[in-house]
UniProtKB/Swiss-Prot annotation:
Enzyme Commission number(s) from the entry: 2.3.3.13
Protein's cellular compartments: Cytoplasm
Protein name stated in the entry: 2-isopropylmalate synthase
Gene Ontology molecular function: any one: manganese ion binding
Enzyme class: transferase
Length: 523
């Protein structure tokens, strides 16, 4: 009988560290709920002590996620563990994940300590975390470069202190698969109490071996794999969860393990993470790339037509990718749109049907036929922008030509007031952005601009993703339209609304902090 491998997702913690712009609480929650639908066992959603915003996002997710265990990261520091517990206490089930470096290099140069002191600190902090929960994970940072005898000492001590999961990270992506498997096997041989904890692995892709190392560790006895959707993360990224999950499913014959993942949700979750994080998926990416199930060779095409198993070790349907494209028109009713969303696997709670149908009709009037990829793009943008907007694009007009200076006129609703400005720029998009900056006085600096066609043909929707700097922070915005300048303007307005909301949240947190301080003085 096969054993279950626990899937531990760190997209919202380790994965987010790679992003050019921080995610909002709403965006993090959207990803967390998708991960819950996909069936991850544990999701690590933040580092609460790092900032009030991270604390709030962990607390919000912990309150709303019911079917996955929510986890927060903490260094082996008292305050870290206490703050993590405070952010998680609203959850139905939670885990505290604490860590400390164990390699000679890290101990000597980073911690300026000794192995004995590290073990003593680990014991104390694991016990402190156990005061808050029975589910405590302990990680040996840089375990891949820690001598096996030292690693075994730390692991044994952490388990004795109450750690229920022991994580063995290849923090810098240094080890080879056969080497990493040897580390796991070595721990099983050397640690007498190892049966009292689940052995976990956390691998990085610096040498392109993250997935290989994780699978080698599973083969050697590890029963939890940590990773991120699409492999996002520090430097070259984390272990790609979708790759590990499907490798376990496809090669059950040799690994003899399974996961509790709903494989039908993999593709949608991957696409959502890509969109929200503004990190496009390479076409040749295993499992979820657009070319993962494409066959261009005539020999391969002939073989697939005769029997898909000739050249496909899994099907697009096995990851939830429905390749049947049904087109709708402006004559299609709300029921038809809802029916198509149902067929694509979307629940009503994931989108606002009224808003989606309004956007669908406007698009159908422009391009005639609306396809599945159009609907998905409209649903995504609608979800991103469904909160009340302080800024709203009311009107814009652009004049430009090969020998003309681009000029834009923009009218923007700012709360209850409508303001208008005109400006010149280096092209129509820049002119629109200059006019918007004049209206708001936010003076944002554009850091990144990317345009992606959502669909096919000359009438495809254009999605613009931008990253902008404001007061030392980076904000992401997205816009969608058949007109590139319009989608660019909408993306900047989305950035402005994100800045406004972040500013309002900071003001509210400051008010609460001041209120608490006043109460202390009164007492």
């Amino acid at each position: 009988m096969s054993q279950q491998v626990i899937i531990f997702d760190t997209t919202l913690r380790d994965g987010e560290q790679a992003l050019q712009a921080s995610l909002s609480v709403k965006e993090k929650l959207q990803i967390a709920l998708a991960l819950e639908r996909m069936g991850v066992d544990v999701m690590e959603v933040g580092f609460p002590v790092s900032s009030p915003g991270d604390f709030e996002s962990v607390q919000t997710i912990a309150r709303q996620v019911k079917n996955s265990r929510v986890c927060a990261l903490a260094r082996c520091v008292e305050k870290d563990i206490d703050v993590a517990a405070e952010s998680l206490k609203v959850a139905e089930a939670f885990r505290i994940h604490t860590f400390i470096a164990t390699s000679p290099m890290h101990i000597a140069t980073k911690l300026r300590s000794t192995l004995d002191e590290v073990i003593e600190r680990a014991i104390y902090m694991v016990k402190r975390a156990r005061n808050y929960t029975d589910d405590v994970e302990f990680s040996c940072e840089d375990a891949g470069r820690t001598p096996i005898a030292d690693l075994a000492r730390v692991v044994e001590a952490a388990i004795n202190a109450g750690a229920t999961t022991i994580n063995i990270p290849d923090t810098v992506g240094y080890t080879m698969p056969f080497e990493f498997a040897g580390i796991i096997s070595g721990l099983y041989e050397r640690v007498p109490n190892i049966d009292k904890a689940i052995i976990s692995v956390h691998t990085h892709d610096d040498l392109g071996l993250a997935v290989g190392n994780s699978l080698a560790a599973v083969h050697a006895g590890a029963r939890q794999v940590e990773g991120a959707m699409n492999g996002i993360g520090e430097r070259a990224g984390n272990c790609s969860l979708e790759e590990v999950i499907m490798a376990i499913k496809v090669r059950k014959d040799i690994l003899n393990v399974h996961t509790a993942i709903n494989h039908q949700e993999i593709w949608r979750t991957s696409q959502l993470v890509s969109q929200i994080c503004n990190m496009p998926i390479p076409a040749n990416k295993a499992i979820v790339g657009s070319g993962a199930f494409a066959h261009s060779s005539g020999i391969h095409q002939d073989g697939v037509l005769k029997n898909r198993e000739n050249y496909e070790i899994m099907t697009p349907e096995s990851i939830g990718l429905n390749q049947i494209q049904l087109n709708l028109t402006s004559r299609s009713g709300r029921a038809a749109v809802k029916h198509r969303m149902d067929e694509m696997g979307y629940k009503e709670s994931e989108y606002n049907l009224d808003n989606l149908y309004d956007a669908f009709l406007k698009l159908a009037d422009k391009k005639g036929q609306v396809f599945d990829y159009d609907l998905e793009a409209l649903a995504f943008i609608g979800k991103q922008q469904e909160e009340p907007e302080h800024f709203r694009l009311d009107y814009f007009s652009v004049q430009s030509g090969s020998n003309d200076i681009a000029t834009a006129a923009v009218k923007l609703a700012c709360g209850e007031e409508v303001k208008a400005e005109a400006a010149n720029g280096n092209g129509p998009v820049d002119a629109v952005y200059q006019a918007i900056n004049r209206i708001t006085d936010y003076n944002v600096e554009l850091v990144k601009y990317s345009l992606t066609a959502k669909g096919h043909g000359k009438d495809a929707l254009g999605q613009v993703d931008i990253v902008a700097n404001y007061n030392g922070r980076r904000f992401h915005g997205v816009g969608l339209a058949t007109d590139i300048v319009e989608s660019s303007a909408k993306a900047m307005v989305h950035v402005l609304n994100n800045i406004w909301r972040a500013t309002e949240v900071e003001k509210e947190l400051q008010r609460k902090a001041q209120h608490n301080e006043n109460n202390k003085e009164t007492v």
